[in-house]
């Protein structure tokens, strides 16, 4: 099990979670952040600092955002396991359902 970032993060990208993550497993996509499921150690440090409450334990993701569990896995299909977001930097792409969403927060 791991933590998942869901739709409230889209077009917000606050990044407070990145600063809290002790293992650097939160990667920046084009429109939202993604938690690497193999690099996350399930510490939960990211969850309480998210100002839009977009981070959930995998088993607790609300049904309306269930697709984001798969999105957090799919984002890393091309990227693999680079061993830390800092060495990768921003990855200017997103996966479904994020890539097909209209701009959020407007």
From Swiss-Prot:
Pfam families according to UniProt: Fer4
Transmembrane segments annotated in the record for this chain: none
Cofactor note: Binds 1 [4Fe-4S] cluster. Binds 1 [3Fe-4S] cluster.
A single MF term (Gene Ontology): 4 iron, 4 sulfur cluster binding
Keywords from the named record: 3Fe-4S, 4Fe-4S, Electron transport, Iron, Iron-sulfur, Metal-binding, Repeat, Transport
SUPFAM superfamilies registered for this protein in UniProt: 4Fe-4S ferredoxins
Residue stretches making up the 4Fe-4S ferredoxin-type domain: 31-60
Binding site for [4Fe-4S] cluster: 21, 40, 43, 46
Entry annotated with the keyword Repeat: yes
Region feature (Disordered): 84-106
Cofactor(s) the protein needs: [4Fe-4S] cluster; [3Fe-4S] cluster
Keyword Oxidoreductase set for record: no
Residues the entry annotates as binding [3Fe-4S] cluster: 9, 17, 50
Its biological purpose: Ferredoxins are iron-sulfur proteins that transfer electrons in a wide variety of metabolic reactions.
PANTHER family: FERREDOXIN (PTHR42859:SF2), OXIDOREDUCTASE (PTHR42859)
NCBIfam families: FdxA_Actino (NF045480)
Protein known as: Ferredoxin
């Amino acid at each position: 099990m791991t933590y998942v970032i869901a739709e409230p993060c889209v077009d917000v990208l606050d990044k407070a979670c990145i600063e809290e993550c002790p293992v650097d497993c939160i990667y920046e996509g084009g429109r939202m952040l993604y938690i690497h499921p193999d690099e996350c150690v399930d510490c939960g440090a990211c969850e309480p600092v998210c100002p839009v409450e977009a981070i959930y334990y995998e088993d607790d993701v609300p049904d309306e955002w269930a697709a984001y569990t798969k999105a957090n896995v799919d984002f890393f299909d091309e990227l693999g396991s680079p061993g830390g977001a800092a060495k990768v930097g921003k990855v200017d792409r997103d996966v479904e359902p994020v890539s097909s969403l209209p701009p959020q927060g407007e």
